[in-house]
Amino acid sequence: FRDAFENEATEFLEKYYPLALQEPVSVPIRRIAENMGLSIMEESLLSSELDVFGLVVFEDGNIKDKNKNIVIRNAKRGTVLIDPRVYYERTLGTVNFTIAHECFHWHRHQPYHALMKMLGANDELGKIIQCSIGSNSKDSEKWKAIDWMEWQANGVAPHILMPTSTAKIKVTELIEKYQIHFDGMDGYRIEDMILELADFYGLSKLAVKMRIREMGYAKIDGVFTYVNGQ
């Protein structure tokens, strides 16, 4: 699925921020959201246990939690809501990830909501998409459309913030800067590289490690080693 995620991210960036496909840059995801016509709000708690990091509103109305309690009244279409607890219980990288996640929903998944509305479906989940940024524990054979949308947005978001084609240039540059040889003796230098990449791309260290692995670096004995492009 990595190629599919990368293709979706490339299409998104071609439309909203093509510079990220031309050279290594920090993707200004908040500015992109604004340019998409989205408003970001970060004042409201979206769930009791922070199992919802953010959501995007497709249709004006009240927003309810999983227990049907109203958590936001009169939310407006085109609003991205981020739970403020994400800042101090997670990382700034998680906030950026969540915003990218919501932007992708707006870009890619509005047709689903439009279809449900046209069909007259009583589809509460189609009015908003709540994002937990975690693995779906249900059997994928039992997933509904909304579960597939979440899975896709979770996969695409880190590719938007750290697109492969130009991120490889940055990684190569830092491998040289930190004199990394992948000989099992440079674990600390690799960690320094990951920290710099996380800061540069506005992602968490874990997300950066996953992206590095997806780009062809396999983790062996605590370090990353290039293995035949796999």
Each PLM stretch: what is its role?
Residues 1-230:
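Active-site hotspot residues in diverse enzymes, especially metal/ion-binding acidic/histidine motifs
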